[in-house]
Amino acid sequence: MECLLVIDSGYSHTTVTPLFNGRPLHRAIRRLDFGGKHLTNLLKEVISVRHFDLHQDTKIVNDIKEDVCFASMDFKGDLERSWKGSKSRQKDKAVKDKDKDMDMIDKLNDGEVRVDYILPDGVHLLRGFSRPHDATVTAAKKRKQTALSSASLHNSEISMTLGNERFSVPEILFSPSDIGSKQPGLPDMILQSLSVLPPLLQATMLSNVLVVGGNAKIPGLPQRVESELRSRIRTEWQVRVKTMENPITSTWLGGARMANKFPSVVREYGVTRAEYLEHGSAWTARRFLNGGSGKGP
C-alpha cells in the first residue's frame, strides 16, 4: 500500500492532495487560497508602511522574502524577542551600564530575530542582502541618511531593520484569520482533507507527508507543519514531514520520471496540443477525472 500526502504550496495557492497507489483521492483534495504572491504582497504593504515605499518594487520585496522570512516555531516568543531591542533602548543609561551582561544576552537573543537588510541601488548593488542587526550602526546610518541631501542619498547604503515582519508574513499560511480570511490554516486544512478517509489511511498518510512548491523553501515551514499536526492528532500516530532538495522543480522531475517509466500512462492521460487548443484546460481535467483518453468530455 503506497500512501503519500502532498502539500503543494506555490505561487497562487496551496493544495493538500492525498495519493493512494499513485492516484489522487479527489474527494479529499483541499485548497488554501494563499501562496507565494500573497506573502510577497503582504510583506510589500508592511515594509511600505514601516520603512520605504516598495509598492512598485515587487522583485526586491520577493528577494527580501526569500532572504529573511521564516516560519516561527514559537510565534509569541519570537514576537517578544523582536521587540527587546526597542524596549532596551528606553532603559536608563545607568541601568544599562550596570547590567552589561544582561544587555549582551538581550542583544544575542534579539539577533535571532532582527536583521538589517541592505537595499539594492540598481548600480553598484543589484540584489539586496541581510546581515546581523547592529543597533549602533543602524542608528548612525539613520542620522547620516537624514543629514544627506536628496542628490547624494543614492551614494549611501540604504538599509532597514526587519523584525517581526520576518515571521508574521509566513504566519498567514497557518492563521489566515490574521488578515481577515475565513479559510482554515494549513494544519486544519490537512486534517479536513484526512477526515474523509478511513482512520488507517489517515495514520499512514500522516507518516508520509511531502511538502513541495516554492514556499517549501521557507526555513522552518516543514518543521512547523509537523509540530502543528503532532499537537492535533492521536498520540500513537506518527507524523513525518519531509521536503525535496529542490521543492520547486521536484514536481516537474516527478512527471518526467513517470513519463519515462510508464509511457503507456502518459499516452492514456496525455493531452495533445491540438486537443488543448480545441477544448481548453477543461479537457485536461476531465481526462484525468474520467480515467483516460477513451473517456474524454
What kind of feature is each model-predicted range?
Residues 1-297:
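C-terminal region/appendage detector
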